[in-house]
UniProtKB/Swiss-Prot annotation:
UniProt subunit comment: Homodimer.
GO cellular component: nucleus
Protein name: Phytochrome B
Biased composition (Gly residues): 38-52
Post-translational modification: Contains one covalently linked phytochromobilin chromophore.
This protein's UniProt keywords: Chromophore, Photoreceptor protein, Receptor, Repeat, Sensory transduction, Transcription, Transcription regulation
Function as written in the Swiss-Prot or TrEMBL entry: Regulatory photoreceptor which exists in two forms that are reversibly interconvertible by light: the Pr form that absorbs maximally in the red region of the spectrum and the Pfr form that absorbs maximally in the far-red region. Photoconversion of Pr to Pfr induces an array of morphogenic responses, whereas reconversion of Pfr to Pr cancels the induction of those responses. Pfr controls the expression of a number of nuclear genes including those encoding the small subunit of ribulose-bisphosphate carboxylase, chlorophyll A/B binding protein, protochlorophyllide reductase, rRNA, etc.
Domain of life: Eukaryota
Biological process according to GO: detection of visible light; red, far-red light phototransduction; regulation of DNA-templated transcription
Positions with biased composition (Low complexity): 1-19
One Pfam family named in its UniProt record: PAS
Length: 1171
């Protein structure tokens, strides 16, 4: 369909149809019950399927390469044998695997075809000082007027046409001035950024656009005849093209957001207006690789293609790869005979023409275009970001690997048409801007999708807190609110709980029997057609139930979602093998390619989307754990919610890292040479560093407590600051905002202070927002300078080149975007001297070739800002980053202002750069380093948290097996200790919520237990360290303790006692060291006449024991400096929740923990119904 790229006649009857039946199994991934949908994401929150999706995409691409190669081979063989290519028969033939040689030959034919289009000529030149000719097209001599039989007027009547021959110096083919341009271009780091060069033939002085790019063996020069001999066209033409693009881009940017269709409709209108083609379309690739025309602008008498769908093979994978390398592809005349490229026999393979603007279309594609009535075409790639970044890829001919081909803008013309390179260059800029705008719209849609996923996760947790599993269908919200469906059902313990439009109970039992027989080895199934999935009773269900998603919870419990019949009308470009189709299917005819017929899909529902299946999968995982724990006799689902949803343990381990970050940041803020201040939630100052005090004349003591809005800023900044505060307190952080601060005391006479600030939300350790911090940069000096510049006050050149450090980096542009000023500060910042850049194009040469940018999108954004400024539209604080001469990455804010004569006529633009100070950059770098380190730790902990569950299940299972064997008394005691330790660890993993411990809402699971078993479990957990450190363990535990029973949360008590004891073991002196355990029971009589058991624990060691900072951390509620201290602090709080308390006591010769724990007696607890 996209005629500029089609390289095979491929037409797949089944490989890419959106209406194809979709049903997928859910295959078991681990013994723990984790599952993932084949081909989809299996993550609990909708985000776990990225890797699977990428793998599936690669798999599809590989499969399509194979099919492309097979059909290409059939087409080539038919041409060689003189037989016509039987289009229909080739499609119907059973697919046979293509050999590696066949695929390699196919790719070589596409990328190294050895022919070009005749509207220009191609040279390949050695990339060295010799400029040796490695290859040339057969028409080179004719186009350059170098053939001996040519009689063309020449500036030099004695000139003799130099021969076009392999090994000759390519510079001799062109005028001396053109040769100099080529030499300069060959020396450039990124040669493609200089395109097009304006060069002339040596003999006739005929002008050409020279489009250069590097390949593996040298430099390819595509020469396209130009239409005028104006020597200024080299610059003026490029600038005019940019202006055309910027004008269209400005109209795109003015469109309202949130409407991708309007954006696409506008693009096709602009492109048709720019290029004059008969038809312009936006062609979008769907996830299954098939294409759809989503927007169209055409001549009135042409047949519309809007809404047509085309198979994935219509745009072969090889062509898609070419579009990623060369974003714009023009075919001037599909009937024109291709021109052969003659190359040096020493070259080991045909010349690579991937980046050539003249590369000839494949014969099959030319036939395809002719059959459909399209003689000329222009196809442009629409590239969007798929995540990630690429700091080094800046060539216009290539793109970062993190980018993906979203679709194409396709232009068709019914007669030969060739548009000049500068206009194609403008279209390329427009496509880059379209991709950026489209990317923002898609990101917005993605954010809305993420919000929906978060709402779904909340819904899952709410469901899990229900008292009974049946609550998910009997209460509101129910499982029908989870995904879009017409009905849902739960089959639980042999009972059927339906909601909405569902099968009858007899039918559901029949479906379960079918699932068990045909899909018993899976953990679920999703299909948009039960009939196509093979269910024999589908006809009896009728249109009411067509699609179904099912999740297996246990071998006998199921969750179902149902969708009713939806008739889908699919217009498909290229008729499928329809029995009534009498058209000639043996050739690539427009009837078989473009006259779409209506296909009504019956007995099929809307497909189940990946996000919907992720939500179903999450509920399946949680309910499976819930049902399993219910079977084991544990409590309701709340513990599972804490274990699955809240990763509180990550907070515990991460606080140590964050504390060090906080200490370092406080030091940096206090000593920073940039203004930094902070406010609380009421907008009152609670932070004011030395630099802002110096600038404003207001000391730290005087500033504390003052209102930022009412006391410290000018009235014109009030609205801005109020908005900043409001957004930051909600978590929305704004950057690069200018505010105007008042001055006080001696500084007051100097006038206001202008500061560019970033607003950062300040959070406490529980992640609650408690204020706002402003990190600023004083731009008062730059502000004064810019005002003088804009108003042409004084001698601006004296200001530009003043070495005063207050003068910011400044450069200027003339009306043609050529650099006209480059001050001392710019020389120091970039490493490029004024003489090296003045007179060069700022877009492409200065920024692009000298100062490298991150990629083509960055170049496009800079071009838009510069042209807007020249046109009278100023830009402030535009983020602008580049690499200096030494490769150092520079981040700045660009302000561009119109440069005008006294009469108001615009003659260019002044550009100012604002650079963060080294101290602030260092602070941010330290912060980024620590945040990266913390994030890495968090990922490690998340991995450990998830993976520790499987071995725990193994230990539990092994213990259960041992319990069923004949054991001796001591062996049974060992088993009881092992089981107690395993259950303690399981509880820590499940109930990892620090917040519930902090606010006292932790649910204690109380029951009767043996204190002797607790002490055995506690001691067992420290024995290895005791032995490793060669410490003596002294046990002072009365026999009555060993036999005593108590009532409480056994495993939390174990956790607390073990942590305190282990701390003594860690810090006991190694030489002649010992650790003592002393336990004393007491009976406490209460005022209500009841008795409680009072247990006194003492864990002691000789010497000082714990370091002071750990003891301090243990009794702190918010500030911690050690990991051990955090653990002890948490245990102290758990102990307090259980009614106990702890003291740490240092005596002259020993140190010890003194722990008091009061517990009810089991009999009295039972009589009171304590829970």
């Amino acid at each position: 369909m996209a005629s500029g790229s089609r390289a095979t006649p491929t037409r797949s009857p089944s490989s890419a149809r959106p209406a194809a039946p979709r049903h997928q199994h859910h295959h078991s991934q681990s013994s723990g019950g984790s599952t993932s949908r084949a081909g989809g994401g299996g993550g609990g929150g909708g985000g776990g399927g990225g890797g699977a999706a990428a793998a599936e995409s690669v798999s599809k691409a590989v499969a399509q390469y194979t099919l492309d190669a097979r059909l290409h081979a059939v087409f080539e063989q038919s041409g060689a044998s003189g037989r016509s290519f039987d289009y229909t028969q080739s499609l119907r033939a059973s697919p046979t695997p293509s050999s590696e040689q066949q695929i390699a030959a196919y790719l070589s034919r596409i990328q190294r075809g050895g022919h070009i289009q005749p509207f220009g000529c191609t040279l390949a030149v050695a990339d060295d000082s010799s400029f040796r000719l490695l290859a040339y097209s057969e028409n080179t001599a004719d186009l350059l007027d170098l053939s001996p039989h040519h009689s063309v007027p020449s500036l030099d009547s004695s000139a003799v046409p130099p021969p076009v021959s392999l090994g000759a110096d390519a510079r001799l083919l062109f005028a001396p001035s053109s040769a100099v341009l080529l030499e300069r271009a060959f020396a450039a780091r990124e040669i493609s950024l200089l395109n097009p060069l304006w060069i002339h033939s040596r003999v006739s002085s005929k002008p050409f656009y020279a489009i250069l790019h590097r390949i593996d063996v040298g430099v390819v020069i595509d020469l396209e005849p130009a239409r005028t001999e104006d020597p200024a066209l080299s610059i003026a033409g490029a600038v005019q093209s940019q202006k055309l693009a910027v004008r269209a881009i400005s109209r795109l940017q003015a469109l309202p957001g949130g409407d991708v269709k309007l954006l696409c409709d506008t693009v096709v209108e602009y492109v048709r207006e720019l290029t004059g083609y008969d038809r312009v379309m936006v062609y979008r690739f769907h996830e299954d690789e098939h294409g759809e025309v989503v927007a169209e602008s055409r001549r009135n008498n042409l047949e519309p293609y809007i809404g047509l769908h085309y198979p994935a093979t219509d745009i072969p994978q090889a062509s898609r790869f070419l579009f990623r390398q060369n974003r714009v592809r023009m075919i001037a005349d599909c009937h024109a005979a291709p021109v052969r490229v003659i190359q040096d026999p020493a070259l080991t393979q045909p010349l690579c023409l991937v980046g050539s603007t003249l590369r000839s279309p494949h014969g099959c594609h030319a036939q395809y275009m002719a059959n459909m009535g399209s003689i000329a075409s222009l196809v442009m790639a629409v590239i969007i970001s798929s995540g990630g970044d690429d700091d080094h890829n800046i060539s216009r001919g290539s793109i970062p690997s993190a980018m993906k081909l979203w679709g194409l803008v396709v232009c068709h013309h019914t007669s030969p048409r060739c548009i000049p390179f500068p206009l194609r260059y403008a279209c390329e800029f427009l496509m880059q801007a379209f991709g950026l705008q489209l990317n923002m719209e898609l990101q917005l849609a993605h954010q809305l999708s993420e919000k929906h996923i978060l709402r779904t996760q909340t819904l899952l947790c709410d469901m899990l807190l229900r008292d009974s599993p049946t609550g998910i269908v009997t209460q509101s919200p129910s499982i029908m609110d989870l995904v879009k469906c017409d009905g849902a059902a739960l089959y639980y313990h042999g009972k059927y709980y339906p909601l909405g439009v569902t099968p009858t109970e007899v039918q559901i039992k029949d479906i379960i029997e079918w699932l068990t027989m045909c899909h018993g080895d899976s953990t679920g199934l999703s299909t948009d057609s039960l009939a196509d999935a093979g269910y024999p009773g589908a006809a009896a269900l009728g249109d009411a139930v067509s699609g179904m998603a099912v999740a297996y919870i246990t071998p006998s419990d199921y969750l179902f979602w149902f969708r009713s019949h939806t008739a889908k009308e699919i217009k498909w470009g290229g008729a499928k093998h329809h029995p009534e189709d009498k058209d000639d299917g043996q050739r690539m005819h427009p009837r078989s390619s473009f006259k779409a017929f209506l296909e009504v899909v019956k007995s099929r529902s809307l497909p189940w989307e990946n996000a919907e299946m992720d939500a179903i999968h999450s509920l399946q995982l949680i309910l499976r754990d819930s049902f399993r724990d219910s079977a084991e006799g544990t409590s309701n689902s709340k513990a599972i919610v804490n274990g699955q949803v809240q990763l509180g343990e990550l907070e515990l381990r991460g606080i140590d890292e964050l504390s060090s970050v906080a200490r370092e940041m406080v030091r940096l803020i206090e000593t920073a040479t940039v203004p930094i201040f902070a406010v609380d939630t009421d907008g009152c100052i609670n932070g004011w560093n030395a630099k802002v005090a110096e600038l404003t004349g207001l000391s730290v003591e005087e500033a504390m407590g003052k209102s930022l809005v009412n006391d410290l800023i000018f009235k014109e900044s009030e609205e801005t600051v109020n908005k900043l505060l409001s957004r930051a307190l909600r978590g929305d952080e704004d950057k690069n905002v200018e505010i105007k601060l008042k001055t006080f005391g001696p500084e007051q006479s100097k006038g206001p202070i202008f500061v560019i600030v970033n607003a950062c939300s300040s959070r406490d350790y529980t992640k609650n927002i408690v204020g706002v911090c402003f990190v600023g940069q004083d731009v008062t000096g730059q502000k004064v300078v810019m005002d003088k510049f804009i108003n042409i006050q004084g001698d601006y050149k004296a200001i530009v080149h003043n070495p005063n450090p207050l003068i910011p980096p400044i450069f200027a542009s003339d009306e043609n975007t050529c650099c006209s000023e480059w001050n001392t500060a710019m020389e120091k910042l970039t490493g490029w001297s004024r003489g090296e850049v003045v007179g060069k194009l700022l877009v492409g040469e200065v920024f692009g070739n000298c100062c490298r940018l991150k990629g083509p999108d960055a170049l496009t954004k800079f071009m838009i800002v510069l042209h807007n400024a020249i046109g009278g539209q100023d830009c402030e604080k535009f983020p602008f980053s580049f690499f200096d001469k030494n490769g150092k990455y520079v981040q700045a804010l660009l302000t561009a202002n119109t440069r005008s004569r006294m009469d108001g006529e615009a003659i260019g633009a002044f550009c100012f750069l604002q650079i963060a100070s080294p101290e602030l950059q260092q602070a941010f770098e330290i912060q980024r380093h620590h945040e990266k380190k913390c994030y890495a730790r968090m990922k490690e902990l998340a991995y450990i948290y998830q993976e520790i569950k499987n071995p725990l299940n193994g230990i539990r299972f092994t213990n259960s097996l041992l319990e069923m064997t004949d054991l001796k008394d001591d062996q049974r005691q060992f088993l009881e200790t092992s089981t107690a330790c395993e259950k303690q660890m399981s509880k820590i993993v499940k109930d990892a919520s620090l917040q519930s411990i902090e606010d006292g809402s932790l649910v204690l699971e109380k029951g009767e237990f043996s204190l002797g078993s607790v002490m055995n479990a506690v001691v067992s957990q420290v024995m290895i360290q005791l032995r490793e450190r060669d410490l003596q363990l002294i046990r002072d535990i009365p026999d009555e303790i060993k036999e005593a029973s108590a009532y409480g949360d056994q495993y939390r008590i174990q956790q607390v006692l073990c942590d305190f004891l282990l701390s003594m073991v860690r810090f006991a002196p190694a030489e002649n060291g010992w650790v003592e355990i002393q336990v004393r029971p007491n009976i406490k009589q209460n005022s209500d006449g009841t008795d409680t058991m009072l247990f006194l624990f003492r864990f002691a060691c000789p010497g000082e024991g714990l370091p002071p900072e750990i003891v301090q951390d243990m009794f702190s509620n918010s500030r911690w400096t050690t990991q051990e201290g955090i653990g002890l602090s948490i245990c102290r709080k758990i102990l307090k929740l259980m009614g106990g308390e702890v003291q740490y006591i240092r005596e002259s010769e020993r140190s010890f923990f003194h722990i008091v724990l009061e517990l009810p007696q089991p009999q009295q607890a039972a009589s009171r119904g304590t829970s």
